[in-house]
């Protein structure tokens, strides 16, 4: 993250990247993104998140498992992937995602998509 150089931009998007960064690097990337946006520029991110409620988390996980099964992915393959990702992903809650955007300076923030454990957020500088 520290090696990434941004030019001035009207729009930056991050698709399923943040969960693969440490909390510190998530904030660093958000800071760099915010600083490189022109006034009125937008930041769009789509991330996998952790539910703030364990019961909902279990329901969402099961529904996502069922979705993958409907796509003819074997139970074994689904479990292997889930296990391999568990050790490399740092998931935030929806509230943490919004708090991080506010922390780096964004004031206009809106959730535009939410499905199970996935969220889309747009923030404007």
Place the predicted regions along the sequence by residue.
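A short acidic, Gly/Pro-enriched loop at the edge of an enzyme's catalytic core
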Residues: 2-12
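Active-site micro-motifs of SAM-dependent methyltransferase domains
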Residues: 2-3, 18-19, 50
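A short SAM/SAH-binding and catalytic strip from SAM-dependent methyltransferases
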Residues: 10-25
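A short glycine-rich, Lys/Arg-flanked "PGG" loop and its adjoining helix->strand segment in the class I
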Residues: 27-39
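Conserved beta-strand signature within the Rossmann-like core of class I S-adenosyl-L-methionine
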Residues: 40-48
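C-terminal alpha-helical "lid/dimerization" subdomain adjacent to the S-adenosyl-L-methionine
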Residues: 48-104
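Core SAM-dependent methyltransferase catalytic element
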Residues: 98-125
């Amino acid at each position: 993250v520290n090696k990434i150089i941004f030019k001035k931009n009207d729009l930056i998007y991050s698709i399923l990247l943040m969960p693969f960064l440490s909390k510190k690097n998530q904030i660093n990337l958000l800071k760099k993104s915010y600083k490189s946006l022109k006034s009125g520029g937008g930041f769009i991110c789509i991330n996998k998140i952790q539910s703030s409620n364990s019961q909902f988390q279990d329901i969402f996980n099961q529904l996502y498992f069922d979705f993958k099964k409907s796509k003819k992915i074997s139970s074994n393959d689904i479990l292997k992937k889930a296990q391999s990702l568990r050790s490399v992903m740092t998931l935030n809650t929806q509230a943490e995602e919004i708090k991080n955007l506010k922390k780096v300076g964004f004031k206009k923030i809106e959730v535009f998509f939410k499905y199970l454990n996935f969220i889309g957020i747009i923030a404007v500088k």
